[in-house]
Amino acid sequence: GNVVNVSLREDSEALEEVVVIGYGTVKKSDLTGAVGSVQMKDVSQVGITSADRALQGQIAGVQVNARTGQPGEAMMIRVRGSNSLAGGNEPLYVIDGMPVEKMNSDINPEDILSMEVLKDASSTAIYGSRGANGVVMITTKRGSTGDTVLEYNGYVGVSSLRKKLDLLGKNDYIAMVNEVSQNDGTGIAITPEQAALLPNNDWQDLAYQTALTHSHQVSVSGGTDKTKLYSSLNYMNQEGIIKGSNYNRFALRINGDQKLAKNLSLNASIAYSYGTQNTANSSADGWGAIAYTAMVMAPIQEIKDADGKYTNFSGTPWGGTNPVGMAELYKNKAVNSRLLANMSLMYDIIDGLTFRVNAGAEVNAGSSDRYIPIGLSAGGKLNGDASKSKSNYYTLINENILTYDKKFNKNHALNLMGGITFQTYQY
């Protein structure tokens, strides 16, 4: 037989990579806990619309699934499965050292440098019970020493229904209806003359669309030995494959680093995002889910009646709302704005001994408006249906951390850390 000699090359560069862990960093070669890392430069070419999608298929033991597939919807992330039947299973999210309430689609993925997922008890223990479901560490881009760089990043993509269901067309549907009528002894239900006047609607074509997604970002970065700055402005628009659904996001970020003295430095970040989400009715509970009614509406059903009103289907015990009317008239709009601001002051007391003070704030404001008019069967049952809600919350956090990190020789090093955290939450 043939002999194949294979020589593996050591990837020393990967071992020297710095991984972000709780309240610090460590070289990958020195890492002992279960931590998965994603460099955004490796996934940015895919054209992801939100930060959480960057984790899909990238880290072992981390499940990232869509909830309903609506544009702008936050993904469901599970680190090594679900740990609680009654409590929450979402991991803790930490952006540039600041724990945040939740991961929304309003976090601009173009601003992210890397993401680390802390998976085991030794890695998440420093966060206590908050880290019981894992911790997702997000590090954003910062300025570097050198010339000022003005950069534009953008992409355009399309999405469409992968495969339509093979449903009956007009002729096959009429043949089936007549066969059922004859078997019942009632004769032909639809004559050829009547059939000639009936439409042949493909409700899947009428309910779904080829959706366009586009994102545009302008960023400026650069700095000197003492001052470094990164700023970005982003706009993203994502259409859903169901007509009437879409998501728009506007995001602004400014990250700055300043060397105040030989042993004193300041880091600051501020990020603002504003998102608008219009969702299609996706529930299958009799309220007229578009995906459901596009399957059960008869191809010979008119889109509108003689009065110009949308028709509704009553050919099943559950009924059905016209999917075209639902896409046009159903309104479910959510607006969310979020402000994240944090600042870190670091003082090198002696060689290896550093004291750091962090202060941060998260302010979130959201509103939701839902309306089903009386012209749709789902709304007609209630003589129309409308709801409105608002939610506002803020988080303030202060951390005081003392770290001693000393490397004595090639084989011996010592790292000690102690601190106290104060956090308040108002809903």
Model regions and ranges:
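An active-site-proximal structural segment forming one wall of the substrate-binding cleft
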Residues: L353
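Short, small/polar-rich motifs associated with maturation and membrane association
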Residues: G1-S273, S282-A284, L340-A341
